[in-house]
Amino acid sequence: MRLIREYKEYTLMDKISDKLSDIFPNIKIVNNVLLASSILDKSGKPNVRIDSKIHLKALMLKFEKNSIEIKSIVNSTGEKGLSQEVMRIILSSIDKDFTIIIDQDVSNGFWDKVIQKHPEYNWIKN
């Protein structure tokens, strides 16, 4: 049973990363954490730092058995709609019984609107 569950999680990560590759050229999955960015850091990993002085688009997701934790969505490029596109990809890839965890809400109301628009999911805001 454990192998089946792990395979399902891998498939979900794979499915989401495939869809995200249209937005983020650099994606890496390490120990159930997906890192995606428009640029690489000095070590060659996707740069997902919130405090980066470089203009970038970045995303960090953590996958658990029946949940996805959104650790960060960063868009310092000035382009509009990144968060909405990321959420469209995530919501179209998961089952309704999944829990979506918002790690830190510094969005000035974005997450409240998403939660209100999609009450069929189980949301947790930290």
Please annotate each region the language model reported.
Residues I4-S43:
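Short amphipathic alpha-helix that is part of the acyltransferase structural core
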Residues K28, L35, M60-K62, S67-E69, ...:
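Ser/Thr- (and often Asn-) enriched beta-sheet segments in non-cytosolic proteins
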Residues E79-S92:
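Conserved acetyl-CoA-binding loop-helix of GNAT-fold acetyltransferases
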